[in-house]
Amino acid sequence: MPVSILVLYDRKNSAIESLARAAASGVELSGADVTLKRTTEAITADLLAADGLLLGSPNWSGITGSLKSWLDDQGDLWEDGSLAGKPAAAFTSGSGQHSGLEMTLLQMIHWMLACGMVVVGLPWGERMRVAGSYYGATAVGDMTTEDMAQARELGARLASIATKLTRT
């Protein structure tokens, strides 16, 4: 049975949605099942049912308030350890290269670590000269083919690690 990955993101009709769809295609290409949901559609059961999580937010001086609220609502999962051991990765978009993209990724990663999740990033590659970060997938301004490629790579990498973790 293939692993299932939840791609959860905040905001509709933005670069973040394009990154979410690209990451989801990477999950699918790896043979895993994927569920793509905005925070307005997702419930706790979606998170619990998934073998891994890809979490995304546009950079608004950090994650959006609505994503922060959604994550705060999952406090019981932090307390009971329900997410411990699940792999997770992050993605973000912003208007400028130095607008705080890595801080936004780190905010999401902080929540993942607090929940005991296994954080998955992107290893160095030539593509990283123009797109992405060790901390996760990124897009700056208009979406590029490199942005889409590194989001797909992150999705496939997360699915691969989720498969390895669920088979051990």
Where are these regions (language model features)?
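Long hydrophobic alpha-helices with heptad-repeat/coiled-coil character
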Residues: 7, 16, 86-90, 112
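N-terminal beta1-alpha1-beta2 submodule of the flavodoxin-like/Rossmannoid cofactor-binding fold
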Residues: 1-82, 128-130, 135, 139-168
